[in-house]
A protein has these predicted regions:
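Second-shell loop/turn segments in exported
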Residues: 56, 114-124, 151-157
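Assembly/oligomerization scaffold segments
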Residues: 1-114
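An acidic/polar, Gly/Ser/Thr-rich interaction patch typically located in mid-to-C-terminal regions
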Residues: 33-61, 244-464
């Protein structure tokens, strides 16, 4: 790939000590790598320092918690700024009169999360709880992008850390856009499972949220919205960019910029993992300790597949997966208590006409959120592209990968219609090489992409 599409311009790197005095360390920075991950709550970064006679560690001194500000201009000449805090120092070594070490950085909230404890009891929807925790406990001024949920919940945090509380809510939260069959069993809903006999009912719907930080702020949204391109009820967004795996020779820079420099598949279709986690089918045993009522449900993903958002054009589970879904590969036992937060004298269970404001909705999220989470990263691919600081985790991009067939056949269909298509950015690193063997600073981006199904949206998938 042409170096012209990788160039960036360092502006200033400043470390502010505990008294707020700023030190310009721009000339000592060898490499700055910024990280985001949808499975991690806070952004992080690594900054390689090549310290020649300054001894910043001893003279500032660096004690931890110092504010680091990195200012630069990206490939497009746009101003970019990162504000982080020193978490720790690693890989420190001395060679002649040079010190080499790496500053591990994180967001301010990433450090203060360990001291912020949630003690207040909440009675609200999950997104309202998360919003209050971030604003009034973690004291962040960053924006929260939250999706509206269906059920209210009563939560007593008992002094949990902010992220620990949010994490406990993620898999209990059901999007308001989710559709499922509420209420008691109805005729014709018996499961094909051999477990539990003819009284086993089917569990339906989809559930589960993710919480993470990206360059825009904090995200608390359902996995289905993250996988939605906006054409379904979950109201997601379409791909922000399209990248191609193709030769760069002779191409103008504006086209080279959207080339995939290299890519590698990182595990595809791990059937054993999926079966061990009960992705395709789970047998759920529920016992309400207040009413002494026992029920069994079977979650069959093949029956609820079309209630989810999908990144590919595949419209059903693969044939063998549907066969496996007929018999649960996991059995779970769950205690319910509809009356935990109910003080009335009548029945609390809303399925039996009760009016509890905060019933136990475990039937509607336990198996569903597990299935949604592990289906989400069925296909993984890692790509390297020219630096694009506009990209963030939670975005979707479209990639076009070559059709690995004979050259004559490739002329008719140049791209792989199953492996290509829309992917979710699950993790990324923006890598700024301040010191480079080639001379000028270079910026490249590594992306970890995931998706749940195969196929390009514009074409029918071959999966049957």
């Amino acid at each position: 790939m042409s170096n012209s599409v990788k160039k960036f311009e360092p502006q200033k790197v400043v470390i502010a000590d505990v008294d707020g005095i700023q030190y310009d360390v721009t000339k000592a920075v060898g490499m700055f790598s910024y990280y985001e991950d949808i499975y991690q709550p806070f952004v992080t970064a690594n900054m390689l320092m090549v310290d020649s006679g300054q001894n910043f560690i001893g003279n500032l001194p660096i004690q931890g918690g110092e504010e680091v500000t990195v200012k630069l201009k990206n490939v497009k000449g746009e101003a970019v700024e990162y504000n982080l805090r020193v978490q720790k120092i690693v890989n420190r070594s001395v060679e002649r009169n040079m010190q080499y070490y790496t500053l591990v950085l994180t967001s301010k909230e990433g450090l203060e999360n360990d001291t912020a404890r949630v003690t207040e009891k909440y009675k609200a929807n999950a997104e309202a709880i998360v919003s209050d925790v971030l604003k009034n406990v973690l004291k962040t001024d960053k924006e929260l992008f939250a999706e509206e949920s269906q059920f209210k919940m009563s939560v007593f945090p008992n002094g949990k850390k902010c992220h620990a509380l949010v994490q406990s809510l993620m898999y209990k939260t059901v999007s308001k856009s989710t559709k499922f069959n509420k209420g008691a069993s109805t005729q014709g809903t018996q499961s094909e499972s051999e477990l539990g006999g003819n009284n086993v009912q089917k569990s339906s719907g989809t559930a589960g949220y993710l919480f993470f930080e990206n360059k825009d702020g904090f995200i608390f949204q359902s996995m289905d919205r993250l996988c939605s391109d906006g054409t379904d009820s979950f109201g997601g967004t379409g791909p922000v960019e399209t990248y191609y795996s193709r030769p760069s020779v002779g191409m103008p820079p504006d086209q080279v910029y959207y080339n995939i420099e290299n890519y590698a598949f990182d595990g595809d279709i791990d059937m054993s993992e999926k079966l061990n986690n009960g992705i395709y089918s789970t047998h759920m045993c529920y016992f309400d300790i207040s009413s002494q009522k026992y029920e069994e449900y079977t979650y069959d993903m093949s029956k609820t597949f079309n209630n989810m958002s999908h990144l590919g054009s595949q419209i059903t589970l693969a044939k063998y997966q549907k066969e496996l879904a007929k018999r649960p590969s996991r059995v779970m036992s769950i205690l319910l208590d509809h009356e935990a937060w109910y003080s009335g004298e009548d029945i609390a269970n809303p399925e039996e006409g009760g009016d509890a404001q905060f019933p136990d909705y475990a039937k509607y999220y336990t198996a569903q959120s597990i299935g949604r989470r592990y289906l989400m990263d069925t296909h993984k691919v890692q790509i390297q592209i020219a630096g694009n600081s506009d990209l963030k985790v939670g975005d979707k991009i479209k990639i076009m990968l070559p059709n690995m067939v004979a050259e004559k056949l490739r002329e008719e269909q140049p791209y792989d219609e199953e492996a290509s298509g829309t992917y979710l950015i699950a993790a990324l690193s923006h890598n700024f090489a301040f010191i480079n063997d080639a001379g000028s600073p270079e910026f490249f981006t590594n992306l970890e992409l995931i998706r749940d199904t195969m196929g390009i949206k514009e074409y029918d998938s071959k999966v049957k």
